[in-house]
UniProtKB/Swiss-Prot annotation:
This is N5-carboxyaminoimidazole ribonucleotide synthase. InterPro entries: ATP-grasp (IPR011761), ATP-grasp_carboxylate-amine (IPR003135), ATP_grasp_subdomain_1 (IPR013815), PreATP-grasp_dom_sf (IPR016185), PurK (IPR005875), PurK_C (IPR040686), PurT/PurK_preATP-grasp (IPR054350), Rudment_hybrid_motif (IPR011054). One of its GO terms (molecular function) is ATP binding. It is an enzyme of class 6 (ligase). NCBIfam families: PRK06019.1-1 (NF004675), PRK06019.1-2 (NF004676), PRK06019.1-5 (NF004679), purK (TIGR01161). Keywords: ATP-binding, Ligase, Nucleotide-binding, Purine biosynthesis. Pfam families: ATP-grasp, PurK_C, RS_preATP-grasp-like. Homodimer. The gene is purK. It comes from the Bacteria. GO terms for cellular component: cytosol. Pathway: Purine metabolism; IMP biosynthesis via de novo pathway; 5-amino-1-(5-phospho-D-ribosyl)imidazole-4-carboxylate from 5-amino-1-(5-phospho-D-ribosyl)imidazole (N5-CAIR route): step 1/2.
């Protein structure tokens, strides 16, 4: 891989035009880069701020070829991209992140094996392809357990929590979508995540460990710093660095973990891109995850990631985006981000708010109650 420096003024091509691409593009443009984007939706969030918008599917080879022609460097905002298209790009354009890590993280089986090969712990699991294999796996792992499709699925899609044997038949419907993975249910104390970024030159940095709270399998809140001992925070960061080095990472990697009741950290999922749980970095850290992404892939020195002040990020799902209209006082000590999606849907990530003050139990509960009264719901 060439370790060239891509200087401001160059064109950065982004595959994917959602909110992650938009915030990436804004950071790139602030640094003096131009941006081109490919997305199936015209006037996508990223398309609204890009210099060039190509409206086409991600695996449209002609669109990918056009993006390569006009861009000095290519990156992406999410992992479920056509591998063949990315592999073609690797040979015909400058794709510093490569395609191999995406291939690993597109499949939960290969992802689990890669995590274990790096020397990190995961919850006990079994790969299942048939109903008989599912039955056998349940006998070995015991219930409750979570059945997930190996490919696809996000924000709670493509998974089923099996609490009792009577639900086996219902869960088995997931097998129609292909190979699945059955994971033991982890009784965890807390969910944590660390965003680690590694540059083309091997320079590495981590952002502060975030505490994540999910509702309906969708991220609801990220609290920083996580309300755990500093030793646990450091252990989480060390795990992320270990994975980044073992996987030969270029760019950002979100490492989601369970903190068990006995203080162990189990790696749950990886995402080789900017991550929802890292949105707090836009306002609470010296450098955001999006700017760090641009620095890393362009070969620039990484920025400092110190936490400037504690706070909490809360997602705006569906019509929760209207909460600000109903109570403008929410923004008194907060920053608002609206992504620019044209249609409000139940469970759709429409924006987020970052509260810039010390997260205390009482006001965290106040915010939680306000959101729960509206309940943006699970993604459709």
């Amino acid at each position: 891989m060439s370790k060239q420096i891509i200087y401001p003024g160059a064109v950065i091509g982004i595959i994917g035009g959602g909110q992650l691409g938009k915030m990436m593009a804004v950071s790139a443009k602030q640094m003096g880069y131009k941006v081109a984007v490919v997305d199936p939706v015209k006037d996508s969030p990223c398309g609204q701020v890009a210099d060039v918008e190509i409206t086409a599917h991600y695996n449209d080879r002609e669109a990918i070829r056009k993006l390569a022609e006009i861009s000095d460097i290519i990156t992406y905002e999410f992992e479920n991209i056509d591998y063949d298209a990315l592999h073609w790009l690797k040979d015909h354009a400058y794709l510093p992140q490569g395609s191999e890590l995406l291939l690993i993280t597109q499949n939960r089986e290969t992802e689990k094996k890669a995590i274990q090969s790096a020397g990190c712990e995961v919850a006990p699991y079994s790969i299942v392809k048939t109903k008989n294999e599912l039955k056998q796996a349940v006998q070995e792992l015991r219930l409750p357990a979570v059945l997930k499709t190996c490919r696809g699925g996000y924000d709670g899609k493509g998974q089923f929590v099996i609490k009792e044997e009577a639900q086996m038949e219902q869960a088995a419907a997931l097998l129609e979508h292909g190979t699945c993975i059955l994971e033991s249910w982890v009784s965890f104390k807390m969910e944590l995540s660390v965003i680690v970024v590694r540059s083309v030159n091997g320079e590495i940095s981590t952002f502060p460990t975030a505490e994540n709270i999910h509702h309906n399998n969708i991220l609801f809140q990220s609290i920083v710093p996580a309300r755990v001992e500093k030793g646990i925070q450091q252990k989480a960061a060390d795990l992320a660095v270990k994975l980044a080095d073992e996987l030969n990472l270029v760019g950002p990697l979100a490492v989601e973990m369970f903190l068990t009741e006995d203080g162990e950290l189990l790696v749950n999922e990886l995402a080789p891109r900017p991550h929802n749980s890292g949105h707090y970095t836009l306002d609470l850290c010296e450098t955001s995850q999006f700017e760090q992404h641009i620095r890393a892939v362009c070969g620039l020195p990484l920025g400092k990631t110190d936490l400037l002040k504690p706070g909490m990020m809360v997602n705006l799902l569906g019509d929760e985006v209207k909460l600000v209209e109903e109570d403008p006082e929410l923004l008194k000590e907060a920053k608002l981000y609206i992504y620019g999606k044209h249609e409000i849907k139940k469970g759709r990530k429409m924006g987020h708010i970052t509260f810039m003050k010390q997260p205390e139990d009482e006001w965290i509960q106040e915010i939680t109650n306000k959101w729960m009264n509206r309940d943006g719901g699970q993604a459709e």
